[in-house]
Amino acid sequence: MKVVDLFAGCGGLSLGFQNAGYEIAAAYDFWLPAVNVYRENFTSHSIYQMDLSDTEAAVRHIMPFAPDMIIG
């Protein structure tokens, strides 16, 4: 099952879902220090620094990943 993680922070939730067998397609966070730590923790997928308050832009960015589930 393909998952996108919103407000991902350093990746704790992503790690839990990954360990449970889910495929993390992408992650999003706005805070640059968290994004940098996430990038160090995960190399199998991208994290995007993005303000998700613009919901239309966020949906346009997330939908190409075709997630089965959005977590965060």
Where are these regions (language model features)?
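Conserved active-site and SAM-binding loop architecture
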Residues: 1-72
